């Protein structure tokens, strides 16, 4: 179950359910009261008997304690659990919005490529991710000093890089395979040194260039054969004693993909990831610039990251589901 506030006036709950052959009537109940719409959802042929649902009701999400979705008539329950705040995508606060003042936000089509359907979601997600990364930087360095050279590898349109750079003085750099994203950053935020990079190593930087390299939602898509070469490339451009903050998708995200019916993930379970260590399934989105047909979805078992990645750089710490309550964040260093 996933919920968010839309324009601060209504809440939407969306998710996936296993249905029969017929359409199902879905009802949302919040704190014991049936609210909102009752809506029919047709099972999708391409997803087996999975059917998606999205139900809206006019109640701020922060007041919701418990929510469930069930089939009308039979009363078969699809969701019945505490409505956990970590699933919220809240509207940006005043503090979130401060870094956007005077900034030209990216084109909506570029936001949608990274899963931000509306500008307020882009701002809120970027702000929260930047907060987590700030905490990691401060934990390692003690503070974010203006002299720190920090690279966001796979920065895209700067969803987390922009709030970091506009809140904290440092020498900020970004690189990405998407030339449209880099053109936007160079136009909207020239204080960030952004460059186009290739889909495969090397990066366009000398050895020992950076005190820190951040990489969010990159290893979540790379094919397995590129994991260690790119990790070695990150190590190359880091100075000795530098920090790498890299995110991966773990068992939780794999379960989401399975329930959602993502091709290649329908029959995978956490024990499969535990056994394999890392699982990858290719897909090619024609709207993505700069990637090849090997671009896909990847899941990592945290123990695999600790064991295998440490052959390149020691993994100091893993924070499970640290980013948007979905992706794991790994802290590595170059000895």
Model-inferred region functions:
Residues 212-225:
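A short SAM/SAH-binding and catalytic strip from SAM-dependent methyltransferases
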Residues 228-240:
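A short glycine-rich, Lys/Arg-flanked "PGG" loop and its adjoining helix->strand segment in the class I
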């Amino acid at each position: 179950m996933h919920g968010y506030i839309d324009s601060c006036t209504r809440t939407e709950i969306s998710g996936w359910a296993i249905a029969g052959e017929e359409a199902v009537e879905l009802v949302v109940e919040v704190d014991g009261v049936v609210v909102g719409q009752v809506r029919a959802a047709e099972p999708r042929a391409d997803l087996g008997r999975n059917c998606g649902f999205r139900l809206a009701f006019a109640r701020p999400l922060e007041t919701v304690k418990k929510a469930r979705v069930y089939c009308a008539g039979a009363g078969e329950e699809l969701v019945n659990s505490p409505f956990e705040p970590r699933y919220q995508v809240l509207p940006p606060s005043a503090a979130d919005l401060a870094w956007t003042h005077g900034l030209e936000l990216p084109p909506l089509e570029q936001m949608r490529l990274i899963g931000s359907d509306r500008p307020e979601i882009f701002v809120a997600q970027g702000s929260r991710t930047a907060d987590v990364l700030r905490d990691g930087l401060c934990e390692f360095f003690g503070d974010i000093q203006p002299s720190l050279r920090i690279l966001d590898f796979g920065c895209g349109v700067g969803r987390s890089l922009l709030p970091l750079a506009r809140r904290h003085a440092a020498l900020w750099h970004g690189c990405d395979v998407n030339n449209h994203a880099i053109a936007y950053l160079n136009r909207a935020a020239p204080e960030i040194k952004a460059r186009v990079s290739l889909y495969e190593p090397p990066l366009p930087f000398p050895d020992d260039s950076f005190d820190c390299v951040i990489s969010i939602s990159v290893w979540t898509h790379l094919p397995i054969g590129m994991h260690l070469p790119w990790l070695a490339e990150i190590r190359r451009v880091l100075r000795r004693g530098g920090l790498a903050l890299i995110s991966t998708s773990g068992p939780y995200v794999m379960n989401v993909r399975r329930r959602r019916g993502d091709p290649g993930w329908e029959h995978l379970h956490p024990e499969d990831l535990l056994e394999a260590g890392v699982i990858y399934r290719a897909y090619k989105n024609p709207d993505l610039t700069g990637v090849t047909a090997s671009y896909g979805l990847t899941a990592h078992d945290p123990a695999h990251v600790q064991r295998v990645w440490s052959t390149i750089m020691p993994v100091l710490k893993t924070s499970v589901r640290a980013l948007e309550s979905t992706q794991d964040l790994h802290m590595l260093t170059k000895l």
